[in-house]
Amino acid sequence: MEKNVTPMIRQYLDIKKKYKDAVLFFRVGSFYEMFFDDAIEVSKLLNLTLTKRENVPMCGVPYHTSKEYIRKLILFDKKVAICEQASNSTSGGPLEREVVEVITPGVIIDEDFLNDDINNYLVAISDYKDYYSFSYIDLSTSSLGIMFYENGFFEKLKRDLEKYSPKEIIVSENFYYEYSEKLNLSRFLINRVPTWHLDKDIAIKTIKEHFNILGLSSLGFDEEKPYYISIFLIINHIKNNLKNLLSNIDKIDINNDSSYMFLDDVTQVNLELVKNNNDFSSQYSLYSVLNDCKTAMGKRLLREFILNPILNISEINTRLDHVEFFCKNISLTVTLRETFINIWDIERIISRIQMKRYIKKDFLFIEKALSVFFTVKKLFDKHNFDYWNFDKFEEDSISKVYFLINSAISSAPDELIKRGYDLKLDNLKDLKINANKYIDQYLESERLLSKINNLKIRKTNNRGLFFEVTKSNYAQVPPHFMESQALNSSKRYKTEKLISLEVDINNAEDNVVAFEQEIFDEIASNVVMHNKVLKKVAEFFAYIDLVVNFGYLAKKNEYKRPVLTSGKEILLEKSRHPVVEHYTKNTEIFTENFVRINKEKYFCLITGPNMAGKSTYLRQVALITLMAHIGSFVPASKALIGITDKIFCRIGASDNIAKGESTFLVEMNETANILRNATEKSLIIMDEVGRGTSTNDGLAIAYSIIEYILEYIKARSLFATHFHELSSINHQAFINLSMKIEKQGNDLVFLREVEEKPSLNSYGIYVARIAGLPLRVIDRANVILESLVGREGNSCLEFLPHVSSDGNDKEILKNDTDIHIKLNEYLELKNFISNIDINNITPFQSIELLNQIVLKVISQSS
């Protein structure tokens, strides 16, 4: 086909060969056109009209509305290569064209494509010579970081993939083939690079060139330990796709695992920290409850805090001090929250300016933010709030940026640079606006000089501006007048000044636009010189917005300050589940509960029926512990919490069909991970471990797990189960808890309140009844349960009424019905008698009760 195509299509095909994995937006006039397979695919995804020209499938989108179409393609995890017309053709062939950028989900910087409260991460994973590392970058916020995996590579990588939720991942071919299935990488957009691209010497050279350094040690790397290969993969990827848009990246954050609480991928999911497990939105997550921040920067920092709880007590207490200050000074808190509404996302704006992707409003937003910055400083001084980490030099730098923008950038919609900022620009603007005025002024000066009272300046399309002099005044024509045309009754003249004035007037509009842009770019360059302190301002706003938010929520929700210790306790009084309480506050009052764990008593077994609140209680303890470690007040009247290095939460499981793993195997994998990695300072949450296999196997496994935790790990643990036999475990660290149940006749009331004793019944049949199972099924279950009570043996089936397989099942069941009814009547009578309190009835009441029993027996006998 290529032999018969037009020169433009041949040009398209040549460019497309270089960007096979991207949709090529090929600029043709005022449209971006797509051809061949791109056109077919995009027309379906975006519901565009697919046409054909010379048998070539094609579709297109207007240039001025292209952003929306690109945004939609990015949401489909597509890469988009933008091919622009580079210049006019001089050879008679097609216009020169080149790809100016490749937009992919992981390298978005356009605010229209970004979510305000979520970082947009591109991740690279390297296993070069078994030096495992994980690097991440958010171009929109200029954040670049790396994790070294010196041990526990696989579990840490799973954790970080869940934590960072990257939009795009770069891996080597070898890594992809080895780990794609194990890590379920198909859920991400993957860029595979040939393994031979992972070259240590090229990586060192590339990183040194980007950061303009002599050696990698200044960045914190040992060149003999090539963890930095993942950084190289990121830099190389962005250079290849976005040309020179790495100018905003000037440092690398090297993350230290030991500073943060470990939350594996399963725990992040089970606790629903930043997204729920239904539609994966933030609603019903801990993040949604704690997020009442007013700035995009504060929202992103909250997400970072939740996923990275800290372990340093001093640092936690500093945060808590700030939260307490704003909780107590609520009028200041309200004022700040109202003020922060006026702050735009300057963290991302500063990055765009560094990458030369700025527009006028970006500078106006910075000006507004810096104005708020100085307002906040005055408020802090007034209220004696001592958190201020800017020195005099930095404050002066911030002032310079503010006054530069304030004096230069116009807020008027039809003006870029303010009048008065640059005299030359003002003159150009005046010339553009007052052209006729300047012509008249010059005409008047020449009239006075020549004394030709009827001297005129006229204009034609062919000759432009000229003086017109009538015959009677020829003798008075000044010597600097140059004749340009003679007519019958007059002559036309030009002067050097008139020619210059005409040129200036004709060029004024273009000159204003060009000179304004020159000044604008110069202002941007000046602002970039202060980028470090401006980023510090952005970080300041993010932190203050967050602790103000925490203080506001503490006051509003009656959260209390937790006390963090170096011990092993988790002591909570009147504690509540923050998420459940938040989303049910308008319909019910949340039942408060205690938690009493210490170094002597650290393992809690929780028994009781489904629906009684066991799972809520488990998550509640984990979430409150985590909240304390991020510096938030907690939903409890009192909280004393020992520093917790890891939280493990194994609640519920489902089949992993993709890996061929059953529910039970998934459960055992998760449990194995906990037993391998938990320490004495960890918190373990387990719910229904062992339920996915036979009763005896499940009970044995659960018992052995508890024994292992008690004897070897000694971690603080909450273990919910329906294996009531486990409550007989005898160990000094063991605590039996259960959920209170209140009987009301044949009904049960779940009080959702914890008490220190084991439950002896799971009330499963009752739960099945209120869930709506058919009455016949419920009756049958009661019969079977009664037949099982007190029995012993290898199989419960030997005690059950048999059902044949010869087609007579229904008849047998029908014949059994009377027996079932009689047994139920017997059980009802037994229940009636067992509820009589003989110590608290009068003689008359006893006779009445005896009469009721006789009547029931007669009724059942008839």
Swiss-Prot record:
InterPro entries: DNA_mismatch_repair_MutS (IPR005748), DNA_mismatch_repair_MutS-lik_N (IPR007695), DNA_mismatch_repair_MutS/MSH (IPR017261), DNA_mismatch_repair_MutS_C (IPR000432), DNA_mismatch_repair_MutS_clamp (IPR007861), DNA_mismatch_repair_MutS_core (IPR007696), DNA_mismatch_repair_MutS_N (IPR016151), DNA_mismatch_repair_MutS_sf (IPR036187). It holds the Pfam family MutS_III. Gene3D superfamilies: 1.10.1420.10, DNA repair protein MutS, domain I, MutS, connector domain, P-loop containing nucleotide triphosphate hydrolases. GO terms for molecular function: ATP binding; ATP-dependent DNA damage sensor activity; damaged DNA binding; mismatched DNA binding. This protein is involved in the repair of mismatches in DNA. It is possible that it carries out the mismatch recognition step. This protein has a weak ATPase activity. Belongs to the DNA mismatch repair MutS family. This is DNA mismatch repair protein MutS. It comes from Borreliella burgdorferi (strain ATCC 35210 / DSM 4680 / CIP 102532 / B31). The lineage of its organism: Bacteria, Pseudomonadati, Spirochaetota, Spirochaetia, Spirochaetales. The gene is mutS.
